[in-house]
C-alpha cells in the first residue's frame, strides 16, 4: 500500500503561463506519468500521458481543444492573458468587428473607383486613368506629410479620440469614392480628396494604434502584441474578402442597393469602433482624464480609478476643452517686464511659472529646466483648478473663497489668485498625488501635451523635482 501511494504521489509540477499546472508521478515501470491539465480560456481538460506520447493525438473533443490551442498561439500574444492589459480581449473583439465592416465597405468603394476610372469601358483612356491615379496618390502623399507635421505630437495625448476620428474620416473617404462615378466631371477632384482623407487616416490610425499597443503590452512584448494584432486583422480581412466576392455581384448594378449596404456597414463600423475605444482603460493621465479625476476629487474627496474615469472620458468633444491649457510655453509669452516676473515668482518655489487670462479662460505655463513629470502634473492640476474657479459646483472651503474673489474681483488681478492657489496646492496636491497612485494611476509618466520650451529664473529651485 505504501509503495502504491508513493507511486501516485506527485514528484514535481510544471505550468505554462497562466494555464493550469500539471503534476508528475512515478509509474510502476519506473517511467514518469504526467497529468495533462491545460486550460484554454473557459476550456479545461486532464488526462494521463507518458513521455514520448503526443499530447495532441487522438480525435474527438481533445482534437478540437488542440485546434483551439493552435489558433490561440497563432492569433494571441504569448503568455495571454497575463502578458497583455486587462482590456485587451474586449478591445480586440470589437476591433475585429469594425475591421470586418470596413473591409466590406472598402470593397464597395474600390469597385466604384474602378468603374469611374473606366474599367470595363472600351471608350476609357488609359492615359486619363493613369493621370487621375497619379494626381490622387500625390495629393495623398502631401496630405500625409502635412498632417504628421501639424498633429503628430498631439496624437499620443488623445489616442482614443484620434482613433475614433480616423475611422469616421475613413468612412467619409469611402463615401466620396462611392459617389465619385456619379459626377464624372469632378471625379478626379473627388477621388483625390478621398485619398487625402485616407492618408490622414493612415497617419492618425497607425500612430494611435502604436500608442495603444504600448498600453496593451505588459511584458515589454510590444512587437509580439503588434504582430498578433496584424495577424488578427489579416484573418478578418480575408473573411471580408470572401464575403465581398459574394456581395459585389449582387449590388454592382444597383447604386441604391450599394449605398444601402454601405450605410448599414458604416453604422456597424462606427458603433464597433466606439465600443472598442470605450473598452480601453488607460492608466496614464491626459488633460481630459485629469480634469475628470480632479473634479471628482474636489467635489467628493475621492480619486476615481482608471476604469471609472475612462468610462466617463468624452470621446466626441475631447478636442475642444473649455479651458485652454498650454504647458511648456516660452517665458517671454508670460512676462515682459521685471515687475511681472517678480509677481509670478513671488510666494512659491515650484519649478514652473503660471499666467492666467481670466477673460479668455487661458492658462499658460513656463517650465523650469528641472521640471519632471510630477511637476508637469502639478502645473496642469494648478491650471485646471484655476479653470474650476470660473465654473459652478462644490469646491473645498479655501477654493470656494477664491471663487468668490474671482467673481467679485477685477480681471487684471489674476496674479494674486495664482499666488493664492499656489499656497492651496502646497497642501492639496500631495494628497491628490497620493490618491492617484493608490487608485492605480501611473504618475511617473503622463500624456499631457507639453511643448519643448524650458526656462530658468532667479528663484528657481536647485533640487530637481521628479
Curated annotation (Swiss-Prot):
InterPro entries: RUS_fam, UVB_sens_C, UVB_sens_RUS_dom. Keywords: Acetylation, Membrane, Transmembrane, Transmembrane helix. The chain crosses the membrane at residues 245-265. It is a single-pass membrane protein. It comes from the Eukaryota. GO terms for cellular component: membrane. Disulfide bonds: none annotated. The keyword Endoplasmic reticulum does not apply. Signal peptide: none annotated. Pfam families: UVB_sens_C (PF24160), UVB_sens_prot (PF04884). The modification N-acetylalanine is found at residue 2. Its main location: membrane. It is found in: Membrane. Belongs to the RUS1 family. This is RUS family member 1. The lineage of its organism: Eukaryota, Metazoa, Chordata, Craniata, Vertebrata. The gene is Rusf1.
